Amino acid sequence: MIRRGTYLNTADNSGAKKVQCIGIPKKVNFGKQTDFATLGDVITVTVKDALPNGAAKKGKVYKAVVVRTAKEVSREDGSYIKFDDNAVVLLNNNLEPIGTRILGPVAREIRAKGFYRIVSLAPEVI
């Protein structure tokens, strides 16, 4: 679960290394509004640490999709999936990835949310 203020790793080669979540869209879950994001959700992030020659610059605000979470997520078949870290892929205004490579595995839930470009670039889909 990603909340406002959470620091996340980037799973692409956009130039950002660490980002911080600054905005989560409201969604209704069992009649209650949730204030957290999970796999496949688009959040607003700001870059906290970046490479000097990368496309993403420190202090800039981007949209990002959550591709890995440390908190376990239940799947429809009853199994659970969790990762070692929280990671995102930075997106442009058209919700396409800024980077040209995806580093590390991504969850299968990304495909269900319609981010086919990220799934095709990922080395492994779990």
UniProtKB/Swiss-Prot annotation:
Part of the 50S ribosomal subunit. Forms a cluster with proteins L3 and L19. In the 70S ribosome, L14 and L19 interact and together make contacts with the 16S rRNA in bridges B5 and B8. The lineage of its organism: Bacteria, Pseudomonadati, Aquificota, Aquificia, Aquificales. This is Large ribosomal subunit protein uL14. InterPro entries: Ribosomal_uL14, Ribosomal_uL14_bac-type, Ribosomal_uL14_CS, Ribosomal_uL14_sf. GO terms for molecular function: large ribosomal subunit rRNA binding; structural constituent of ribosome. Keywords: Ribonucleoprotein, Ribosomal protein, RNA-binding, rRNA-binding. The gene is rplN. The keyword Oxidoreductase does not apply. It comes from the Bacteria. The keyword Phosphoprotein does not apply. GO terms for cellular component: cytosolic large ribosomal subunit. Binds to 23S rRNA. Forms part of two intersubunit bridges in the 70S ribosome. Belongs to the universal ribosomal protein uL14 family. It comes from Persephonella marina (strain DSM 14350 / EX-H1). GO terms for biological process: translation.
